[in-house]
């Protein structure tokens, strides 16, 4: 019995897998995504040895020799379609980001109390919860993510900090949000007649 315990197997090592920096798949599967050319360039720059194994002339010719002519043509057409689709989606996304406005609204709560409401950050790739937490820390005030009646998520910050928030957003997220896309709005409550 004592001999069995001493002959325990060596510790199993986890396999190291390289993931593509463009599509986040292993490089062997990049060809099935829409960004095959970009993935290939990334692999060439970052992992030359793996690039040689997957995309060298010998590897490509051995893979193509196994396919029939009609299958090769179909594969080329499919790859071209996927690439065109990915390029169109990327262009639409860039256009949508360029047109999207981040609205910083100062809303009067009662008499001299105000809240600042920020909408449109998620379009620029920012997470509302993280930004709300950072705002709360930065301005030492309460901030939360709420759903507006329109169903859009918005960040509500207690206090009149709209101009400070604009400066802070440009300072921290200037790359994601251009200054021309940030809009300051003053929203006053209507007085009840009676």
From Swiss-Prot:
Q: Which family does it belong to?
A: Belongs to the DENR family.
What's the encoding gene here?
tma22
User: Chief subcellular site?
Assistant: cytoplasm
**Which organism was this protein described from?**
Neosartorya fischeri (strain ATCC 1020 / DSM 3700 / CBS 544.65 / FGSC A1164 / JCM 1740 / NRRL 181 / WB 181) (Aspergillus fischerianus)
Q: Has the keyword Acetylation been applied to this entry?
A: no
Q: List the disulfide bonds.
A: none
According to the UniProt entry, its GO molecular function terms are: mRNA binding; translation initiation factor activity
The UniProt record lists the SUI1 domain at: 102-173
Instruction: Share what the entry says about its subunit structure, partners included.
Output: Interacts with the 40S ribosomal subunit.
UniProt xrefs under NCBIfam families: DRP1
The protein in question is named: Translation machinery-associated protein 22
Location in the cell reads: Cytoplasm
């Amino acid at each position: 019995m004592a001999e069995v315990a001493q002959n325990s197997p060596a510790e199993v090592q986890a396999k190291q897998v390289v993931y593509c920096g463009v599509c986040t798949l292993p490089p062997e599967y990049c060809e099935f995504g829409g960004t095959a050319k970009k993935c290939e360039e990334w692999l060439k720059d970052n992992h030359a040895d793996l690039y040689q194994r997957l995309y060298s002339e010998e590897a490509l010719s051995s893979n193509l020799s196994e396919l029939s002519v009609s299958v090769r043509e179909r594969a080329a057409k499919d790859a071209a379609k996927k690439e065109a689709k990915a390029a169109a989606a990327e262009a639409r996304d860039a256009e949508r980001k360029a047109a999207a406005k981040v609205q910083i609204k100062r809303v009067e709560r009662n008499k001299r109390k105000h809240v600042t409401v920020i909408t449109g950050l998620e379009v620029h790739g920012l997470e509302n919860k993280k930004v709300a937490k950072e705002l709360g820390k930065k301005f030492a005030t309460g901030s939360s993510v709420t759903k507006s009646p329109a169903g859009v998520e918005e960040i509500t910050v207690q206090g009149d900090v709209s101009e400070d928030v604009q400066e802070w957003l440009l300072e921290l997220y200037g790359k994601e949000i251009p200054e021309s896309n940030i809009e300051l709005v003053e929203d006053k409550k209507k007085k009840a007649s009676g």
